[in-house]
């Protein structure tokens, strides 16, 4: 580990989770939890009857935009380089999401989100901003054990949460979607029990 300590183990469980990709604009960090969110599925209920902006170019963002039309009074979707499935884009627009082709430049607000400055100079007044730019995992650590991350930066596991390397298990968000606590808890239990069985079998 970082302090130089070496730990010897017969088994290891990767439960490093993921980190949501940030937009990297002023106001994002300061207003996180005060109108800035990285999960529309998690926080949609908090924005009933309010105005929101979805930020992202892929299918995840399209799905989130369509979802928020069921809750928000007005849903804007900023997608400046659309990569989403055209069918999902159409579904979001048909549901009422207003597609903006400019990129957010600054998230503004005093104590809470109030508006977003776009790179074309326009200002969108909203109560919430959902940044849906995907996520990255801590899979670099797993590469040292030759557990190659999948193309989507996840670790492939079997039903017992084992990986292709004997004795190495993975659970939670690092194994892919859905990124939900319930899944992480369940897989954590499975991985823990499987690791115990593996170690016992090696004695």
Model-derived segments and spans:
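A Rossmann-like FAD-binding core segment of flavoenzymes
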Residues: 1, 6-8, 70-157, 200-203
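A conserved FAD-binding loop/helix module that cradles the flavin
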Residues: 62-65, 171-203
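FAD-site-proximal beta/loop scaffold in flavoenzymes
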Residues: 19, 24, 30-46, 133-178, ...
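Nucleotide donor/acceptor-binding cores
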Residues: 10-11, 34, 49-52
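N-terminal Rossmann-like NAD(P) cofactor-binding module of classical short-chain dehydrogenase/reductase
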Residues: 13-14, 130
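Rossmann-like NAD(P)H-binding beta-loop-alpha module
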Residues: 50-71
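Cofactor-binding loop segments of dinucleotide-utilizing enzymes, especially the Rossmann-like FAD-
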Residues: 41, 57, 80-82, 173
């Amino acid at each position: 580990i970082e302090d130089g300590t070496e730990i010897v183990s017969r088994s290891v469980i990767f439960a490093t989770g993921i980190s949501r990709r940030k937009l990297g604009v002023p106001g994002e960090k300061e207003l996180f939890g005060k109108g800035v969110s990285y999960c529309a599925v998690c926080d949609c209920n908090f924005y009933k009857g309010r105005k929101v902006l979805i930020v992202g170019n892929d299918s995840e963002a399209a799905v989130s935009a369509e979802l928020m039309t069921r809750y928000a009074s007005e849903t804007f979707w900023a997608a400046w380089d659309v990569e989403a499935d055209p069918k999902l884009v159409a579904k979001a627009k048909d549901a009422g999401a207003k597609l903006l082709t400019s990129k957010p430049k600054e998230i503004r607000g005093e104590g809470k989100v109030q508006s977003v400055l776009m790179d074309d100079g326009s200002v969108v007044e909203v109560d919430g901003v959902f940044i849906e730019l995907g996520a990255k995992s801590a899979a670099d650590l797993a590469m040292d054990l030759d557990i190659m991350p999948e193309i989507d930066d996840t670790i492939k596991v079997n039903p017992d949460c084992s990986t292709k390397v004997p004795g190495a298990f993975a659970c939670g968000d690092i194994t892919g979607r859905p990124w939900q606590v319930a899944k992480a808890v369940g897989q954590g239990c499975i991985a823990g029990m499987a690791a115990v069985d593996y170690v016992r079998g090696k004695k």
